[in-house]
Amino acid sequence: MNQNRFWKQAFSFVLLLLVYGVYQFGNKQAELKQPGEYDDLLSLQQAVSAQRSKVWFNETQFTVYKLLADDTKGSRHQRFLVKREGLPTLLVAHNIDLAPRAPLRPGQSLYIKGRYEWNQKGGVLHWTHHDPRGVQPGGWLRLGEEKYQ
């Protein structure tokens, strides 16, 4: 009977260690995904190579390559090109009717969260703003600690 009790206690101890390990691993994963620390480059690379659209991506770092004229047809969009190693040059269309204009300059580093749409020129990053209806998760542009959403 003592041997049976020993195995029950040993099993309980191992189970407790396993639960603790899973809990700690989950916390470490959450810590990795804090803004500016987690990069969704792989998701974007896969979307580009598979020519997929409507792909939401987490905050990812880019460099402003070129500022373009605003798109003023329909909803107004601040437009600019960004670069990132491992990706083609991408167009960003940031809706300035829903979010503030970001003060950008070429060569500047920024973080973008939004949605990728494939096209033959590489693709467009958009939904870099809140969703006024609260249906989509929404995104942002982030310069330093300042978010434009």
Language model features by range: what are they?
Residues 3-149:
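OB-fold and OB-like single-stranded nucleic-acid-recognition modules
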